[in-house]
Design a protein with these regions (language model features):
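Gram-negative and organellar
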Residues: 1-4, 8-635
């Protein structure tokens, strides 16, 4: 009809309307030919720009849909071919933009939208200044794109403002808008507001989709499906892992064919320190093609947690090609890259002891003592091996002077598939006490692990060392955990000192988390110990024939400040119990400890703390004040 109306007329207005009609019908080639045929560039110079803007808009939408289809079909490496092509063309076309402010704004609005869809957040935000208006004055879809970009750039406060502005638009807010606002709140630690938003989402998001076709039943709306998953993950963000696992187990029982829910369950299982179970959950879908991308990412993270380095590396390399914009994949690559760097660990303890009986301190560790250990690790070699250098130093201040024990060592460590072994050769710095230390540990499954150790130059009491004695130590331990919140363990150590004393030590513990929240975890533990010494009181150091101890411990960890890779937390610990040794009645023991933990960056952390405790020995109390300092990081 438009073509018949314009045929035979020389009216420029009619010709313009005809071109606009062609544009509306996406007939861009014919519109371009008509502009050239009628030489409309002279009389309507902006018309070709209007055509180009419309063409860009349509190609952007097609590119976004093509990306979604490629991801669904597990062809992530092809996802952005179409979108990259239109972005390249838009970048080249920018120099041809007319002076008309409205057309220029329209171009940059579309450019921002496309850049955000391509996960190029910084570039999207950089276009704001070119529009000549503020973000709050922009169209709804552009504000949404900028909100997503700010969230990706770790600027959640700006994202929150833009997301909230979208709710003023009638019928615009869908799951994606709600979810964007939710994560902008979570990343600002606004957990209470995020909880309220979930309640509002439950009210506002549709539950079902209905079909007009006769006999077709209603189905769960996509927004509702996504919301059900987010509701479970909210428990995780609040550190309520048990609730999250219980929630997804119930959801999976109701919808066993939903891969997304199964993947969420697997994620929670890994966070609960059960990576084997997590992988078993995913393996149920091995025969389903194509493999869901989220499940591939979870499988990659499981390989990392299981110490399957080669598999972890292969999966990360593959996902970097198909899902390189995903933050989980990027973090995995950074963790792999970290293994190519040297690392360092250090811990020192300084203490001062007092007693009403000064002679008692001479049988313990002196009036002052220090213990420190530093280990420098090489980069990982061939994925599973690394060399390390170790320095340990301990000394005590006694009435007759300081007694020191300082050692340096070189070792080799191997780790793979939740097993680890190491050997270290060491030498004292002021003597010929050459030693060999062997260690082995193995996770049998998600719940049980054990460790074995041997040290030919054990850390025997300094008083025995000063008399020229040496000792060997044999250790073994067995640990159990239900998950991250409930753990128990037992250990045995035999120290054979060549002064005739054989010291046997048994210890056990049980630990249970009591309270969890977004910023805190409160735990309680029971610890017990038994010691037996063959030489008894004849030794020049504290050496009861037998001794027993039992104590209850309350711990509280509080994340005081957090910003992505950095955080500051405080640790409080209080312990009380009883100690009894042969020949003396039982007396109480106490200990208080307070520590600061700084995550300075993704790869460096620092801690320091102070403590005070009372412990009876030979019926007399030792009052000990101590300080702890430690750090670790990657060069």
């Amino acid at each position: 009809a438009a073509q018949r109306a314009v045929e035979g007329t020389e009216s420029v207005d009619a010709q313009e309307q005809y071109v606009l009609a062609l544009i509306m019908n996406s007939d861009y080639a014919k519109a371009r030919q008509y502009i050239q045929l009628k030489q409309l560039d002279a009389s309507r110079p902006t018309l070709r720009h209007v055509l180009k803007m419309s063409e860009f808009s349509e190609r952007i939408q097609q590119g976004i849909q093509a990306a979604k289809n490629a991801v669904t079909m597990n062809r992530g490496e092809e996802a952005f071919i179409s979108l990259d092509a239109v972005l390249a063309e838009m970048k080249a076309y920018e120099a041809q933009l007319p002076a008309d402010p409205a057309l220029r704004r329209h171009f940059y609005y579309e450019y921002i939208f496309a850049l955000n869809a391509r996960n190029l957040a910084e570039q999207a935000v950089a276009q704001i200044a070119k529009t000549g208006v503020g973000p709050m004055e922009m169209p709804t879809y552009v504000r949404h794109a900028l909100a997503d970009s700010y969230l990706r750039m770790r600027q959640p406060k700006k994202a929150e403002k833009l997301y909230k502005s979208l709710f003023a638009e009638k019928n615009y807010a869908d799951y994606n808008v709600y979810a964007g606002l939710y994560f902008s709140l979570i990343e600002q630690e606004k957990f209470k507001e995020a909880d309220k938003l979930l309640v509002e989402m439950d009210k506002q998001l549709p539950t079902f989709m209905y079909s007009n076709a006769k006999g077709v039943d209603k189905v769960t709306h996509d927004d509702r499906t996504e919301f059900i998953g987010l509701k479970g993950l909210n428990y995780v963000y609040r550190k309520e892992h048990a609730k999250a696992e219980r929630y997804f187990n119930e959801i999976v029982a109701k919808a066993p064919a939903n891969i997304s829910y199964q993947n969420n369950l697997a994620i929670v299982q890994r966070w609960r320190e059960k990576p084997e179970l997590s992988q078993q959950t995913l393996d149920q879908w091995n025969s389903v093609e194509p493999i869901d991308q989220s499940s591939q990412i979870t499988s990659m993270q499981n390989a990392q947690a299981l110490g399957q380095i080669q598999s972890w590396r292969q999966q990360t390399q593959r996902l970097m090609r198909s899902a390189g914009d995903d933050t989980g994949v990027q973090q995995s690559k950074k963790a792999l890259d970290d293994r190519r760097h040297a690392t360092i660990q250090h811990r020192s303890t300084f203490s001062k002891s007092e007693s009403d009986n000064d002679a008692l301190l001479g049988r313990l560790k002196g009036s002052k003592e220090q213990e420190s250990g530093t280990r420098l690790n090489s980069p990982w070699l061939n994925d599973n091996y690394r060399l390390f250098a170790d320095h340990s130093n301990r000394w005590g201040d006694y009435e007759q002077g300081k007694i020191k024990d300082q050692r340096v060592g070189l070792g080799l460590e191997w780790a793979s598939d939740r097993k680890a072994a190491s050997i270290m050769l060491s030498q004292s710095t002021d003597g010929d006490r050459f030693g060999v230390q062997l260690d082995w540990s193995h996770w049998l499954n998600d719940h049980w692990s054990y460790a074995l150790g041997f040290d030919s130059q054990a850390d025997i009491p300094l008083q025995a060392l000063a008399q020229g004695h040496e000792g060997e130590a044999y250790t073994m331990s067995l640990n159990w955990q239900a998950n991250e919140s409930r753990k128990a363990g037992a250990a045995y150590k035999l120290t054979d000192i060549n002064d005739g004393n054989a010291r046997q030590e048994f210890s056990a513990f049980f630990k249970q988390q009591l309270l969890q929240g977004p910023h805190y975890i409160t735990s309680a533990a029971l610890r017990g110990g038994y010691e037996k010494n063959d030489l008894g009181d004849y030794a020049p150091y504290f050496n009861p024939k037998q001794s027993y101890s039992a104590e209850a411990v309350l711990e509280h960890d509080w994340i005081t400040w957090r910003s992505y890779d950095r955080h500051f937390s405080q640790h409080f610990e209080a312990a009380a119990g009883t100690f009894k040794q042969t020949g003396f009645s039982g007396k109480p023991i106490y200990n208080l400890y307070y520590q600061h933990d700084w995550q300075l960056s993704r790869t460096w952390k620092l801690n320091y703390g102070v403590g005070w405790g009372v412990h009876p020995y030979d019926g007399e109390d030792e009052r000990r004040t101590y300080a702890v300092f430690g750090f670790e990081g990657r060069f």
